[in-house]
Amino acid sequence: MYRTAKTTLIGEAIVRLSKSGDFELTVSKGPGITLLSLRQDVEFAEFNANFTGQRWSGPLTEAPPQLRGWLGLRDQFLRAPNRKTLRYVSGSEMFFFHF
């Protein structure tokens, strides 16, 4: 779940982490309906939010401020890759994952 004062997003999440630290997050509402996808490594990210039409890709150092919370998820998952529950707050954004 993703929540701000004005937005709530609930869906099924698939998280992939590679041994080299590559991160992939896909949030969907059932088969074939992808709401959001994020691919990220140490230096680069690609973000597609189909539910808002927001898209961005490039070096992390050039990321728009509104993506900072999403781009912080990689580090959260890398700290405890086998965690069943993850709660992460970044500014006014709250992320909650339960696997």
Language model features by range: what are they?
Residues 17-22, 39-44, 81-83, 99:
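Short, solvent-exposed coil/turn segments at beta-strand boundaries
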Residues 54-99:
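C-terminal low-complexity, charged extensions that often adopt amphipathic alpha-helices
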Residues 8, 14-16, 37, 46, ...:
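Ser/Thr- (and often Asn-) enriched beta-sheet segments in non-cytosolic proteins
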